[in-house]
Amino acid sequence: VLTAEDRRLLQASVGKLGCRLEDIGADALNRLLITFPQSKTYFSHFNLSPGSKDIIHQGEKVGKALDSALKHLDDIRGTLSQLSDLHAYNLRVDPVNFQLLSKCIHVSLATHLRNEYSASVTLAWDKFLELVADVLSEKYR
């Protein structure tokens, strides 16, 4: 459960990023494909070269979804419902990949925020990303 302090820390850290969440999403997706090559199976029709336009475009979608979820924390399930349907019913993405991507998002955030990515900020993001992964995985049940 995200506390009021978690919400405050999330919003404050986004304001300190110095880039858009779309850039974080693109960086994180690039890291995912390099670090966890098994995730490439979902992107066989993409140019999977690091930094390719396909990866950047898809990563920007990840960032936009995170931004939308952050703006609608009180209705995160409703906000991500269509995305959850897409991943469960059409793309059939193994839910473990949401956890792997979360790890990569943490690295991207830490890279951009540096000293601002304190233990409390890390915990707030961890709770948020866990919630997002849970919402995206719930249609699999």
UniProtKB/Swiss-Prot annotation:
A Pfam family annotated for this UniProt entry: Globin
Globin domain residues: 1-141
Does the entry feature the keyword Heme, yes or no?
Answer: yes
GO MF term set: haptoglobin binding; heme binding; metal ion binding; organic acid binding; oxygen binding; oxygen carrier activity; peroxidase activity
Q: Name one GO cellular component term.
A: haptoglobin-hemoglobin complex
Q: Which GO terms describe its biological process?
A: hydrogen peroxide catabolic process
Which tissue types show expression of this protein?
Red blood cells.
Which positions bind heme b?
Answer: 57, 87
What's the subunit arrangement here?
Answer: The deoxy-Hb is a heterotetramer of two alpha and two beta chains, but oxygenation results in dissociation to dimers.
Q: Of which family is this protein a member?
A: Belongs to the globin family.
Q: Outline what the protein does.
A: Involved in oxygen transport from the lung to the various peripheral tissues.
Listed name of the protein: Hemoglobin subunit alpha-D
Taxonomic source organism: Erythrolamprus miliaris
